[in-house]
């Protein structure tokens, strides 16, 4: 089976006029349970299951790989609708979209791994985000090299270091760890 045959039904069957209606319904459903996650602090797994059922976790995965092939500008409408219902879910979804929008153009990832991450998002709703912020460095947006070290071993790579957080970490399948190699 090719990756393109894994595309969720929603991305194949909903026309643009109906998409706004679908997003409004999703917003309402997410809003109905937002208080549960606000009060408990739990990861909103059911929200991501719902988004996956609608093909929205793979929205920025290229069409050739089974995703929606959407640009970040197009994904903005989905983010707005999700944020209207449940902002924490929207923040994690933003990270998913950002990672997938850059992943397939990255030559620092082996092709087989890039394809696997995309396939996992399409098929299983797998989430990805970056681990970049460190105790001493803070956010890398200010410059500097990470203290996290990646060393090649006979078995692959060994990564050691400490990250402070990653948005959505409790529900991520994939972690893109920012490190320097030695």
Identify the residue ranges that each predicted region occupies.
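Amphipathic, small/basic residue-rich leader segments at the start of a protein or domain
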Residues: 1-95
């Amino acid at each position: 089976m090719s990756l393109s045959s894994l595309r969720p039904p929603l991305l194949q069957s909903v026309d643009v006029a109906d998409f706004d209606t679908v997003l409004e319904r999703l917003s309402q459903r997410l809003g109905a349970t937002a208080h549960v996650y606000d009060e408990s602090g739990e990861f909103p797994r059911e929200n991501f299951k719902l988004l996956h059922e609608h093909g929205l976790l793979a929205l920025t995965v290229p069409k050739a790989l089974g995703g929606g092939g959407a640009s970040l500008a197009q994904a903005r409408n989905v983010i707005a609708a999700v944020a209207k219902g449940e902002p924490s879910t929207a923040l994690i979804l933003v990270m998913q979209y950002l990672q997938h929008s850059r992943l397939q153009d990255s030559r620092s990832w082996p092709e087989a791994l890039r394809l696997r991450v995309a396939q996992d998002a399409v098929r299983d709703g797998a989430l990805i985000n970056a681990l970049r912020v460190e105790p001493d460095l803070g956010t890398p947006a200010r410059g500097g090299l990470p203290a996290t070290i990646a060393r090649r071993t006979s078995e692959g790579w060994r990564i050691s270091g400490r990250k402070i957080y990653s948005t959505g970490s409790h529900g991520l399948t994939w972690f893109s760890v920012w490190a320097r190699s030695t």
